[in-house]
Regions:
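Glycine-rich loop-to-alpha-helix module at the N-terminal edge of alpha/beta enzyme cores
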Residues: 7, 36-125
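Active-site-adjacent loop/helix segments that line or gate small-molecule/cofactor pockets in enzymes
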Residues: 1-28, 42, 75, 190
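Conserved small/polar residues in nucleotide/adenosyl-binding loops
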Residues: 227-232
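Short beta-strands and strand-loop turn motifs
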Residues: 38-41, 169, 208-213
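Residue-level signal for well-ordered, solvent-exposed loop/turn and beta-edge residues enriched
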Residues: 35-36, 220
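PLP-dependent aspartate aminotransferase-fold enzymes
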Residues: 85-207
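Short, acidic, Ser/Thr-enriched surface-loop or helix-capping motifs
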Residues: 31-32
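Conserved PLP phosphate-binding loop immediately N-terminal to the Schiff-base lysine helix
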Residues: 210-223
Length: 232
């Protein structure tokens, strides 16, 4: 057991009191004590359709037998193009290009690179500053940690984080939002902090703003009404 170093886990305590899952089916895990445990996190949001769905298993098996892997350098499989097209058709009209990555961390770091690269090729090389949000989680890559706002994830790596990052305040205020149904009505004014940050640094230096629609890892914080689409 000591060979595996678990992430985001106090390993010394875990080895004394291990939680071992042996199987999963539908919305449940089954541990080594025979207990049936409801998976309230959907496999850390990676299994939203449940575990061990035979239809998904059959599709994976069929694809593996046809083509298990095709490098994306100078070539691609027909299935990859078909999947990209399906994703683009389901996305908002302005999001019509797909770039595949292996994880959320890789996706965030890639998105930051795309933002900076885009501005550079457009002749705006000064646009390198990123804006994230307090308490945000954007993965474990250095870019994601930099734009993220979780202190415990950042404090040991300050010298390695990308420069030029600022953070918006988070939207949680229990005194105003407790027991709200749906999106809270209070808090839209917090979006105005973005204008202050842009004015502070000059709009010509901003490369991108990155926000989680719902801040998951810090408590499933639902944004307030009009936060991401403030009225003019």
């Amino acid at each position: 057991m000591s060979a595996y170093w678990l992430p985001f886990t106090p390993n010394r305590y875990f080895h004394q009191h291990p939680k071992i899952m042996q199987s999963a089916k539908g919305a449940y895990y089954y541990d080594d004590h025979g207990r049936k445990l409801f998976d309230g996190l959907s496999g850390l949001w990676c299994s939203p359709l449940g575990h061990a769905d035979p239809r998904i298993g059959a599709a994976i098996s069929k694809q593996y037998e046809t083509m298990d892997y095709c490098p994306a350098f100078q070539m691609a499989s027909e299935d990859t193009f078909r999947l990209a097209t399906r994703i683009a058709e389901m996305a908002p009209k302005s999001l019509d290009k797909v770039f595949f990555t292996n994880s959320g961390s890789e996706a965030v770091d890639t998105a930051l690179k795309i933002a900076v690269g885009y501005h550079r090729v457009m002749g705006n090389a000064s646009r390198i500053r990123m804006i994230g949000r307090d308490r945000a989680y954007h993965g474990v890559g250095m870019g994601g940690i930099s734009v993220g706002g979780m202190v415990a994830n950042r404090k040991m790596f300050a010298s390695m984080m990308i420069p030029g990052v600022d953070h918006l305040p988070h939207t949680l205020n229990l005194s105003q939002m407790a027991f709200s149904k749906g999106m809270p009505a209070w808090g839209a004014h917090l979006a105005e902090e973005l204008e202050k940050i842009v004015a502070l640094h000059d709009a010509n230096t901003i490369a991108a703003v990155i926000l989680e629609p719902v801040q998951g890892s810090t408590g499933v914080i639902v944004p307030c009404l009009l936060y991401t689409s403030p009225s003019p």
